[in-house]
Design a protein with these regions (language model features):
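Alpha-helix N-cap and loop-to-helix initiation/capping positions
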Residues: 3-6, 41-44, 115-120, 186-193
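Alpha-helical scaffolding segments of alpha/beta enzyme cores, especially the outer helices
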Residues: 13, 44-51, 80-87, 124-128, ...
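Short helix-capping and hinge/turn segments at secondary-structure transitions, especially at repeat
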Residues: 54, 105, 130-134
């Protein structure tokens, strides 16, 4: 219950401190600062999110929640969570919600290194994916944050996943302190040509592909994935 109330407070705090009161789209991503599939409150909050947004005074034509998961193999309730979220996405939101799998590589050995051996194998993920219902609205997403070292085999991806269910999203490794310290290649990442080598083979295989090219301004403003902005002042009235 405390987590549920915290999520409600977070959304309310964001909206109340913005001057925008009308928007075409309000996105909420359950991701990155904690694996959402460990938290059943995410499912419950997905149901009440529209009402929370409305009660805060924001008029949004579309409220679009997204669950992004690295598919932890220690979570015995993982598939049940994902199937329940698919029901929320497809039925409650009429397709206007998202489910994203952080795949990151089509090579299991590289994935074990990237996820510290805490994610399911590609074979297991493929089996779970085959049992997902056909998506309404936007397809489910296979996410690949890419660097020069990323292994992304388009033919292997086609063997593992259904193109009718999934799209591929190619994103950057943002230029955070952690990324630099761990030796990820982030130079030139705001140049579209960096991603073309990954995109073209996927297109040739018949995949729908989204390429997200960031801007330096996003990292400078610390609004991207992997960044946390901590106030230097003291918190009051909390």
């Amino acid at each position: 219950m405390e987590t549920f109330l915290l999520k409600r407070w977070q959304i309310r705090n964001i909206i109340k401190n913005e001057t925008v009161r009308n928007t075409d789209r309000f996105n909420v991503h359950f991701a990155r600062m904690g694996e959402p599939t460990w938290n059943d409150n995410v499912l419950a909050f997905g149901i009440v999110l529209k009402e929370v947004v409305k009660s805060c005074g924001l008029i949004a034509k579309t409220v679009h929640p997204v669950v992004s998961t690295m598919l932890p193999r220690a979570n015995r309730k993982l598939e049940n969570f994902i199937q329940t979220w698919c029901g929320i996405k497809n039925d409650f939101y009429g397709g206007e919600a998202g489910l994203q799998f952080s795949i990151n590589s089509t090579d299991d050995e590289q994935r074990r290194e990237l996820f510290d051996n805490k994610s399911h194998s590609l074979a297991t993920i493929s089996e779970m994916a085959s049992r997902l219902p056909m998506p309404k609205g936007r397809k489910y997403t296979l996410n690949f944050p890419v660097t020069a070292q990323t292994i992304l085999d388009a033919k292997e991806l086609s063997r593992l996943f259904d193109k009718e269910k999934f799209i591929v999203k190619i994103t950057p490794i943002h230029e955070t302190a952690s990324a630099v310290e761990n030796g990820f290649e982030v130079t030139g990442y705001s140049d579209y040509n960096v991603y073309r080598q990954f995109e073209q083979p996927l297109l040739e295989e018949g995949w729908d592909v989204i390429v997200f090219v960031p801007s330096k301004e996003e990292d400078a403003d610390r609004i991207t994935c992997g960044n946390a902005l901590i106030s230097e002042g003291r918190f009051n009235n909390y």
